[in-house]
């Protein structure tokens, strides 16, 4: 890599860290290419990204961002997983680490808050933003549905009584 490529990488990572809802840092020593591609595809499907960069360049890119507190995590073979959704990157990384003991989560950041490995795993257990929105919409819609049923109940009762009278007259 020449200097221009390094500058581009640092600029790209800096923008990514600035826009990221969460960042996860993990050791990946011993992971095969197929496993890494699997992790990347799962992360991409969840709306996140996995990058492997030189630690020195990642540290430079982190300077001046909200996630600057995790600079100390960059030792050894590290990968960076990030996503705009604060839950997506930790969830995919934690799920992958459960099935593959060679991926060791070191920690991460969500905004200005730095997280240790347990914090990242705890964050991964939370529902995603879309799931929370769906639950909220469901909670809001349920009372409206019940009110509509209660309002329509007297009309339905009257219709049943009239229907019963009509059947009674036809039978007689």
From Swiss-Prot:
Coiled coil: none
Protein name per UniProt: Large ribosomal subunit protein uL10
Organism whose genome encodes this protein: Mesorhizobium japonicum (strain LMG 29417 / CECT 9101 / MAFF 303099) (Mesorhizobium loti (strain MAFF 303099))
Signal peptide extent: none
The keyword rRNA-binding is assigned to this record: yes
Described purpose of this protein according to its UniProt entry: Forms part of the ribosomal stalk, playing a central role in the interaction of the ribosome with GTP-bound translation factors.
Family, as annotated: Belongs to the universal ribosomal protein uL10 family.
Quaternary organization: Part of the ribosomal stalk of the 50S ribosomal subunit. The N-terminus interacts with L11 and the large rRNA to form the base of the stalk. The C-terminus forms an elongated spine to which L12 dimers bind in a sequential fashion forming a multimeric L10(L12)X complex.
Family annotation (CDD domains): Ribosomal_L10 (cd05797)
Keyword annotations: Ribonucleoprotein, Ribosomal protein, RNA-binding, rRNA-binding
MF (Gene Ontology): large ribosomal subunit rRNA binding; structural constituent of ribosome
The keyword Ribonucleoprotein is annotated on this UniProt entry: yes
PROSITE patterns: RIBOSOMAL_L10
One Gene Ontology biological process: translation
A Pfam short name: Ribosomal_L10
A cellular-component GO term for this protein: large ribosomal subunit
């Amino acid at each position: 890599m020449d200097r221009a490529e390094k500058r581009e990488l640092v600029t790209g990572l800096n923008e990514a860290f600035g826009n990221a809802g969460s960042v996860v840092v993990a050791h990946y020593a011993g992971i095969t290419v197929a496993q890494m591609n699997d992790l990347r595809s799962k992360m991409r499907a969840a709306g996140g990204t996995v990058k492997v960069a030189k630690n020195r360049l990642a540290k430079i890119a982190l300077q001046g961002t909200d996630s600057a507190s995790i600079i100390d995590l960059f030792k050894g073979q590290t990968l960076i997983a990030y996503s705009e959704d604060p839950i997506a990157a930790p969830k995919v990384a934690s799920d992958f680490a459960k099935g593959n003991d060679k991926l060791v989560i070191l920690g991460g950041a969500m905004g200005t808050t730095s997280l240790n490995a347990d914090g990242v795993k705890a964050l991964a257990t939370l529902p995603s933003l879309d799931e929370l929105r769906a639950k909220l919409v469901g909670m809001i819609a349920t009372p409206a549905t019940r009110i509509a049923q209660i309002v329509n109940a007297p009309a339905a009762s009257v219709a049943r009584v009239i229907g019963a009278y009509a059947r009674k007259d036809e039978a007689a």
